[in-house]
Amino acid sequence: MKIMIVWRTVPGKYRPALEAFLRAGGPVPPGAKTIGRWHVPGSIFGWHLVEGDLTAVAQHVGEWADLLECEVYPVIEDDEAATAAKKLFAK
């Protein structure tokens, strides 16, 4: 399963969040794999696309909870969305 984590730094925690990222790099726990991570330069926002099980994603989000506010969304690719849409119109 692919999961998009949308994050922003907690108010007042920008520097500690950046220091933690520079120190460790934000690795995900076993059971998850980073597909990509994007940052808005000079801002507090970013996205992290992860593939894996929800337990590992929950652990990862929890590891950053004191520094980042996260929204977690399951995401699918175009072919999967098209398959679902075709089933809707087949009714």
Q: Across the structure, where does each feature detected by a protein language model lie?
A:
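Conserved, structured core segments of small domains
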Residues: M1-K91
